[in-house]
């Protein structure tokens, strides 16, 4: 099965001081470069809460008021994860609904983070 999401070849997943695994720059990334594109299935809030979150956990990003993009099986889960941890001072932003871009120049070895309040409907 092909990955549902795409991460830049300038990135790698490794252990994070923030939480579990994280996404890191393995080469310098220029401001506005595309770092990742989230993929998956589009589902409504009810389907997400009833069928997906209980078994897969929080794996979605919100793309509209009542629409989310998410994996729907355990096999797809790993293939859709971006591993971008949360930060209130992130170095990634979102262009459109699913494209993650560098908000500033990022040096090799920096952890790549985004503000999770921008991708889900939880209260932070």
Question: Positions of the model-derived regions?
Answer:
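Conserved catalytic SET/PR domain of SAM-dependent protein methyltransferases, capturing the structural core
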Residues: 1-124
